[in-house]
A protein has these predicted regions:
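N-terminal "arm"/small-domain region of PLP-dependent enzymes with the aminotransferase-like
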Residues: 1-51, 317-320, 334
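Conserved core of the PLP fold type I
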Residues: 32, 37-174, 179, 185-204, ...
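Conserved core segment of the aminotransferase class I/II
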Residues: 201-270
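Residue-level recognition of strand-loop junctions within catalytic nucleotide-signaling folds
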Residues: 225-226, 258, 301-303, 344-346
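Conserved glycine-rich beta-strand-loop-beta hairpin in the small C-terminal domain of fold type I
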Residues: 270-281, 289-302, 311-316
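Conserved C-terminal alpha-helix-loop-beta "cap" of PLP-dependent enzymes
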Residues: 300-340, 350-354
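PLP-dependent enzyme catalytic core of the Aspartate aminotransferase-like
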Residues: 317, 333-376
Length: 376
């Protein structure tokens, strides 16, 4: 009998019927509007119009305090494009960008496009290790550090306040800009302050919408340290339109934020994800090193003696597709071997439970096999 296949590969919010309903209502509203949509396609939405940027500030909410002025805000067509723009502008060819030793695979690709060297900083369960961060600053004279430390991908950790303060002090000491990506922060309650709140003078804050609303929404908000810093980048990018938000996309998302539709969809996603992650924790939380979250993925270390690719391959052969930590290490061999399953793609709670129970079964098989092997 064929095994049921479930993909936990993507870090995506769950599909909600309310999202389709919101789109249908939006198209109907556009059709009934006295304003012609064609007018929106006659010119670029250069770094977002004032309404777009105001919507960005509203969406970011209290993740940045005090509230940033619109003159510090840029709207782009997605987080990855934003990272490319900042990497090429803040770091530059031949220079060094620091990241967590495990980070989004796309960051390595974007760095290659920008001819930037990536150096990984060691992490623990609280994120970047200050000692190693300072060591890398002395050794490589980096221009910037990219951090995804609020539900880190892949390990799902959240960097606590004291660690953020330590990283901030070192970044200021060595003149390193912080590129902070809060892809999942809005799923959590009682968060530490963002770097953009603690150290606005050295932080570039990113928040996209694809991890909150739907993977195909290519729109992100960037908050610069100052108006002057943003102007410097915009002057460099002005001749290029590939990073501008698409007019129709920007109109839809700005309208949704302004009317509260986006916030309602986010809250529905939060509720659904909490149900799914509760199942994950119920099935896996007794495994040493397991890290759940209220977000769209979790972390499960491989059994001792098993590398991440062996672990993910065995799970895949059982019909559940997951990403190994090797993908997040670039050209290096990862120090942490495990998997980063996403919980957004299963069709319902029952499929979520099925998938994580299969993962648990494979984990136990591999663990027991290694224990027998070690005892021989």
């Amino acid at each position: 009998m064929d095994r049921k296949q479930v993909s936990l590969m993507r870090a995506t919010p769950p599909h909600l019927p309310a999202f389709s309903e919101a789109l249908q209502k939006t198209w109907a509203a556009f059709a009934e509007s006295d304003e012609t949509l064609a007018g929106q396609f006659r010119q670029h939405r250069y770094h977002g119009n004032e309404e777009d940027r105001a919507a960005g500030v509203e969406w970011i909410g209290n993740r940045i305090r005090p509230t940033p002025g619109l003159d510090r805000v840029m709207v782009t067509n997605g987080t990855m494009n934003s990272i490319l723009l900042l990497t090429s502008s803040l770091v530059g060819p031949g220079k060094v960008l620091l990241t967590e030793e495990l980070t989004f695979p796309q960051v390595y690709t974007l760095a290659k496009i920008a001819a930037v060297e990536v150096q990984g900083v060691r992490i623990d369960q609280q994120g970047l290790l200050p000692d190693d961060f300072e060591r890398k600053c002395k050794q490589h004279a980096p221009k910037a550090v990219y951090v995804n430390c609020t539900v880190h991908s892949p390990t799902a950790h959240v960097m606590p306040t004291e660690r953020r303060r330590a990283i901030t002090e070192i970044a200021r000491k060595y003149g390193v800009q912080i590129i902070e990506d809060e892809a999942q922060a809005l799923y959590l309650d009682n968060l530490p302050d963002s770097f953009a709140t603690m150290a606005p003078d050295v932080t570039w804050f990113l928040m996209g919408l694809s991890k909150y609303l739907s993977l195909g929404i290519r729109m992100a908000f960037v908050v610069a340290p100052s108006e002057r810093a943003l102007v410097n980048i915009l002057e460099r990018l002005r001749p290029i339109s590939t990073w501008h938000p698409a007019p129709l996309m920007a109109s839809v998302i700005t309208s949704w934020i302004r009317t509260g539709v986006a916030q309602t969809l986010l809250e529905l996603a939060r509720i659904e994800l909490r149900k799914r992650q509760a199942i994950v924790s119920e099935v896996l939380s007794d495994i040493d090193g397991f890290q759940g979250s209220p977000g769209i993925h979790f972390w499960l270390p491989a059994p001792a003696g098993v590398d991440s690719e062996q672990f993910s391959r065995a799970i895949g052969e059982a019909g559940i597709l997951v990403r190994p930590s090797k993908l997040y290490a670039g050209d290096r061999e990862p120090r942490f071997h495990g998997i980063r399953p996403g919980v957004g793609d299963p069709v319902d709670l029952a499929e979520t439970r099925y998938a994580v129970e299969v993962i648990r079964g494979i984990y136990k098989q591999l663990r027991d096999r290694m224990m027998i092997h070690c005892s021989d």
